[in-house]
Amino acid sequence: MGCCIGSFLNVVIHRLPQKQSLVLPSSHCPHCGEAIAFYDNIPVLSYVLLRGKCRQCRAAISARYPLVEAMAGLLALALFRRYGFEPQFFIEFVFVVMLLAIAFIDLDTFLIPDVLSLSGLVIGLLASFLSIRLTWVDSLMGILIGGGFLYLIAIGYQYLRHQDGLGGGDIKLLGMIGAFLGVPG
């Protein structure tokens, strides 16, 4: 399951910054544009069997695809071993795959999409009602302290240096992290 989610994360990582649909067209080779058959779209395994190349044009496929799939699979396995199919598994899995998508998008574009960080913030707050680790008050405090702390740093830097030193995406991301993790201590 985790590797399949990782496969979808690759779609998100590749298409979201380009403002492309996450649903259509179906998976295709980034080089020749040929649609990828379902049997060539099995997470990690297809990459290995095809030796990292497109079946149609033989162009190399980035190793990032199986890396993201494997990372999502390993994270799912680790969380499942800890929580089983309890609500906390799903809460924390959503959190880590959102972080994974954000990390790779940020690596490519130096941008953190609001659609991920803000929806993650809301999901984290709502998930706190089901969480065994924190209450909704902890989650709300995490949002305010996490995002608020970076916001104050950004304002202070801008006041002192008369230029932006921190992007708004970082502030929203820390708010999202605070929503899922609450306030330490």
Segments from the language model and where they lie:
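Alpha-helical transmembrane segments of multipass membrane proteins
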Residues: 5-10, 72, 76, 127, ...
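Active-site-flanking alpha-helical
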Residues: 13, 79, 177
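Membrane-proximal soluble regions of multi-pass membrane proteins
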Residues: 9-64
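Functional transmembrane core segments of multi-pass inner-membrane proteins
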Residues: 89-185
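Membrane-helix interface segments
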Residues: 38-40, 63, 86-87, 136, ...
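Transmembrane helix-loop-helix
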Residues: 81-91
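Hydrophobic alpha-helical transmembrane segments
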Residues: 1-4, 76, 80-81, 125-132
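Select subsegments of transmembrane alpha-helices in polytopic membrane proteins
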Residues: 62-68, 114
